[in-house]
């Protein structure tokens, strides 16, 4: 038996406390913690205010699990098309040893400021094998 586990350390946000993904889900949706204004025509770095670690879990013998850190990716959800935003670096590659804050660079391609609402989900974390 082997599987992928994602540890999320929220820094003040409670959005992830009861979040459970189902078998077959492509990734884990990320919630914006606050209202964020992205100025028109600008690129900015947005902080999700979480730290994460993804591990590949193997059962090495009955009942004994071994966790090996693995890299993961930050990608846009398909619903981002409804906004003027796009991920500035297309795909964010997060190394297996990175333990800093999870952030995303976004471009606002509109002629108007765009407001990201708290709890809005425009990005997700996925395993590279997807």
Task: Please provide the spans of the model-predicted regions.
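DUTPase catalytic domain/fold
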Residues: 1-130
């Amino acid at each position: 038996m082997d599987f992928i586990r994602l540890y999320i350390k929220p820094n003040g946000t409670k959005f992830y406390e009861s979040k459970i993904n189902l078998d077959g889900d492509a990734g884990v949706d990320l919630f914006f913690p606050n209202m964020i204004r992205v100025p028109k025509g600008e690129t900015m770095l947005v902080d999700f205010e979480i730290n994460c670690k993804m591990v590949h879990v193997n059962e090495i013998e009955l009942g004994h699990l071994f966790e090996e850190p693995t890299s993961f990716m930050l990608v846009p959800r398909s619903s981002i098309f409804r906004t003027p935003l796009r991920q500035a670096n297309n795909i964010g590659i997060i190394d297996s040893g990175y333990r800093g804050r999870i952030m995303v660079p976004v471009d606002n391609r509109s002629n108007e400021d765009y407001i990201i609402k708290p709890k809005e989900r425009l990005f997700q974390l996925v395993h590279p094998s997807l």
